[in-house]
Amino acid sequence: MNQEIMNLFNPTTPAQVFDQIRISIASPEKILSWSYGEIKKPETINYRTFKPERDGLFCARIFGPIKDYECLCGKYKRMKYKGIICEKCSVEVTLSRVRRERMGHIELAAPVAHIWFLKSLPSRIGLLLDMTLKDLERILYFEYYVVLEPGLTALKDRQLLSEEEYLRAQDEYGQDSFTAMIGAEAIRELLKGLELEKLETHLRAEMQETDSDIKHKKLAKRLKIVEAFRFSGNKPEWMIMTVVPVIPPDLRPLVPLDGGRFATSDLNDLYRRVINRNNRLKRLMELRAPDIIIRNEKRMLQEAVDALFDNGRRGRVITGANKRPLKSLADMLKGKQGRFRQNLLGKRVDYSGRSVIVVGPELRLHQCGLPKKMALELFKPFIYSRLDAKGLSTTVKQAKKLVEKERPEVWDILDEVIREHPVLLNRAPTLHRLGIQAFEPVLIEGKAIQLHPLVCSAFNADFDGDQMAVHVPLSLEAQLEARVLMMSTNNILHPANGLPIIVPSQDIVLGLYYLSILREGLPGEGKLYGEMAEIEHALHSKVIHLHTKIKYRCEGMDEEGKPVTKWYETTAGRAMLGQVLPKHPRVPFDTINKLMTKKEISGVIDQVYRHCGQKETVIFCDRIMALGFYNAFKAGISFGKDDMVVPSSKWKIVEDTRTLAKEFEQQYNDGLITHGEKYNKVVDAWSKCTKKISEDMMTEISAVKKNPKGGEAQINSIFMMSNSGARGSQDQMRQLAGMRGLMAKPSGEIIETPIISNFKEGLSVLEYFNSTHGARKGLADTALKTANSGYLTRRLVDVAQDCIITADDCGTKLGIKMRAIIDAGTVVASLASRILGRTAGEDLREPSTNRIVVKRGTLMEESHVDALQQAGIQEVKIRSALTCELVNGICGKCYGRDLARGTPVNHGEAVGVIAAQSIGEPGTQLTMRTFHIGGAAQINEQSFIESNFDGKIVIKNKAIAKNSENLSVAMVRNMVVAVVDADGTERATHRIQYGARMRVDEGDMVKRGQRIAEWDPYTRPVLTEVEGIIGFEDLVEGQSISETLDESTGIAKRVVIDWRSTRGGADLRPAIVIKGKDGKVQKLARGGDARYMLSVDAILSVDVGSVVKSGDILARISTESAKTRDITGGLPRVAELFEARKPKDAAIIAEIAGTIRFGRDYKNKRRISIEPMDKEEETREYLIPKGKHIHLQDGDIVEKGDFIVEGNPAPHDILAIKGIEELAAYLVNEIQEVYRLQGVLINDKHIEVIVRQMLQKVEITDQGETDMISGEQIDKIEFDQINAKAKEEGKKIATGTPVLLGITKASLQTRSFFSAASFQETTRVLTEAAVNGKVDPLEGLKENVIVGRLIPAGTGASMSKIREVAIKRDKMILDEREKQAAAIVPTAPEAEPLALPTPE
């Protein structure tokens, strides 16, 4: 009978409707209630009849029939016997589908421990009983007895006894004087005997008493698990199993293969092993076998059950016939191939096809070419239904035949079906949401899918053999979403940065660039044209050239929309470009009246989108694409050998550099400079040489040449390609026609000898060999990068997946301050770019007049940002995802503008996932390597500060001394020079290096480009603050100082050596002191002695007895040694920041403001303490390894947050010392830094969303009168709720500090255990969730995908909203009805009993 008809008669039970899912430990009673019968035999199916054995693992009596509505012996067949149990074979006649749902069980002859609660660390059983895992295993695996009741004997409670000790104790005290047991029974008794309430009171009391930190932590852990058992309704003894559930047979199938063999699921083997051992144990017990045999059997049973639940967690892995480990129940869930990730989160879909893509330049932006053959297959059901509706076929079979024969009417119907039915195109890897877009299919001949050229950058596709997949949205809702949300015309802007992503590239750019070139001196220059037709005529008759400078009268629009005409100096090409520009007052002809490079074109598209809207933009893009292709073809730009111009000055520059390098070599041989310095200088010289040659080559290539008639000649083709942004970069041109330059070794160091040849001249054998290192490393890196970047994206998505816009405004007053990011004097990210599309967190006032420019709560558009710039506002407080106060999700105001649409963000937008994709997608472009900074990278070491603005100098924390050479020297580390304009607005601030020579003073006027200060970038000085005579302390020749004589100059150089490693030098403390005329040590202004400690490798600049003035250099520390440190860059750096790892050589940060004091050294560490200014705080102490250079002196004053030892700060320290805002600013800037280096633009808000997710937890510092445990980490939301409740009841509230978690850790600690379990460490997450009886409220995206519902984002969010409203209304209506019913029913009088007729 047909399946559909059966389903009519058998309406399936409606799917359960649920709002949340709870997980807990199953009690034996629960397992029995699930079970349909006990499995007694290990047999599976009979190998001859293929029928399941009775009471075996596939028993039909327990699990249900094998065929629909047919018992095993065949007595009852068909539907009419539904529900009957056959008396012969005892099988219920029903659907065979029940074999996927019905469970069985195995009654164990002896209890066994559940391995997850035993071995999944921390061991839950161990924590509850306060026993070590080792002891537990000894008891469980029958090595030791445990005393349960010591009675009146000298034994202790829970004491372990070996076999001998046990027998001896029995002899000594008598058999019944104490109780001791062994195995899982013993543990079960112990767990049963726990009184959780008493235990909890006892633990809390103990925690109050203890002072030891470690003990407190241990007690807190126990307390937590005791509470978990108390409140979750789980009983501790359930962790020991007496019944094992057996999963339904169709979930562990056994399939006969041809040749009489069977393919089976590993679970069957594991179950068989359990049943065999269990049956053997039962038999041995009946036979009253010796204890030792029974014990061995019990141990084997425990091992069999362990292997079934989690093979390999304890002891040897149990393997199958072919030495392959068997897949246990836990393995079914874990990892990429497990249930969660393979089947629940990612499924394969039908109605899909894939093919190679080719370019479709004649398509419109919303179209794609779909091969007819493919369309016919994909839309088959639709075609069948249309054929049926038109009466061309009566049955599906007939329709099938028609389609197979490809009759003409089938093609007509296909056209009908496809019309306005969008399809989804996807290119793997789908790194961000633009990797799947919807298009309207256009039927084409051939077998390749045609793709519109402008969407290639979104898909990251090219036509060198890429394949794409097509999916058909079936339901009406799906088609609607595809059209309204996913259509390629709706994805013009990039969600990561809000810039257009539908941007012309390559040939289109080249064509448009060629079209917009203006060349002087061509025939017809200066002619006047009134309209386009005249220009076209002139072009055809060769009166003018495309590039001739002409005057053109162009019609535009004014603000009211009235036409205005204006004369422009332009070219014929640009006039043609002006034809496709939409008419709008904000998009005048000037927009395109310039040389169009890729960047310019992108700007024009952005402008058109902002002012003219989406429809106009799409039409404009299609038009300029056509124009670009056409002109690229007309231009006929090609590229010959002579277009690569080798600069004439090349060999002279090379020769000069060679001489210089020889000089450095000579200096090294003479001992004037160290090897490191020589290496740095040589590499420096070659970098400069490469740069110079490259600059000369660019000037020669881009030079404007004249043709014989005096006009400008055609521009160099290669220069056009590179300059327009179509293909190639200056760097590649340098390698073609300049010199290849320096190469790196595989280790990342730079090879001293550069490659002098370029590709045009050809490389020598040695040069070629040197260049293979880098190339090979590049390929290896790329392979690793892809995997790493993918993993980063996965972690980001997982941590942010439940971040959704759930409300318009949370009403918070908080926000973060934004200012332009300035690096070494250049603006890297302007204030305008950072605040565009964000909400103002306060009224923004113009500093000079105090008038409000932007009101609080305004979403800042381009116009507002311009106004702020004109008002000269330097710092803006904006709302941010970090400070949003919503309980679930983020509010629209704190998020700001939806970057992909340019409008305020919608409800239900999954901003977390968008943020994760925006950060993860460019991951593959980041580098993988850690840089060894040396030579080439050192050129960008700055040695001066220039002013970027005209203005007046203001110096904060001023401390300047005049030294012996009468130069002004900066004497403190926190001196800041600000440049102030006429209104008193700070235009720029610069932090001055310690020891820098100042070129300006307070109140000086500076011009733009004037130097403010300069310093030696290669050394760090130690300066004196007082004048006097030099004295040495503990500077002993050969112990703490070594003198080297430079032969060529005869100068002695004294360097401090590591005094701890020399004999008798352990207690030395080398220093320079400044003495007065009386021979006493001078005092500093702030009270300490003028004694300057020296660190290893310091080079002395003074002698004993010489006179110094304040500001003179006593010693200098070469930073060259500090400079070859590894700098983690690229992907590893991003991962390090998001994982909140402590960096190697972390900086030490002052936790309080105060005075530095050096204490007694401890082993090989320096002891530094800070005496607080605020007398109520306590002194903080730091131990610092002696090799590290501490640039502070005794008595220096530090601010909170100052670095005591330089380095990368650990994010946790920043959070603890400076707070959330500083931490966020640090993380955002550091991450942006990495992306900026690669030229990737990402909006700050994406990083803020991720950082918000990393700051979800609070660590309890004081529990107050709540049930929380101090030291535990708890969700912010939960923390606030508990505190609010305590406040209501008038109790003392708890206090906590925010904790920063890395993204992996944060994902594992989300409120949803489903989401965490499907991410990583499945076993641990599920064990913990079960012990706590956790409830998953199904709020995030992941959990909803897993249980197969609409996700609560996008259209799913609106659906759930509607559902909520409906439920509320239903409740109201029902309540009303009940009220009315209660009101209507009158109180009836007592009814008389009915008189029943008495039976005869």
From Swiss-Prot:
The keyword Metal-binding applies. The RNAP catalytic core consists of 2 alpha, 1 beta, 1 beta' and 1 omega subunit. When a sigma factor is associated with the core the holoenzyme is formed, which can initiate transcription. Keywords: DNA-directed RNA polymerase, Magnesium, Metal-binding, Nucleotidyltransferase, Transcription, Transferase, Zinc. One of its GO terms (biological process) is DNA-templated transcription. Gene3D superfamilies: 1.10.132.30, 1.10.150.390, 1.10.1790.20, 1.10.40.90, 2.40.40.20, 2.40.50.100, RNA polymerase II, clamp domain, RNA polymerase Rpb1, domain 3. This is DNA-directed RNA polymerase subunit beta'. Mg(2+) binds at residues 462, 464, 466. It is an enzyme of class 2 (transferase). The gene is rpoC. It catalyses: RNA(n) + a ribonucleoside 5'-triphosphate = RNA(n+1) + diphosphate. Belongs to the RNA polymerase beta' chain family. GO terms for molecular function: DNA binding; DNA-directed RNA polymerase activity; magnesium ion binding; zinc ion binding. Its cofactor is Mg(2+); Zn(2+). GO terms for cellular component: DNA-directed RNA polymerase complex. Zn(2+) 2 binds at residues 810, 884, 891, 894. The keyword Zinc applies. Zn(2+) 1 binds at residues 71, 73, 86, 89. Its EC number is 2.7.7.6. Binds 1 Mg(2+) ion per subunit. DNA-dependent RNA polymerase catalyzes the transcription of DNA into RNA using the four ribonucleoside triphosphates as substrates.
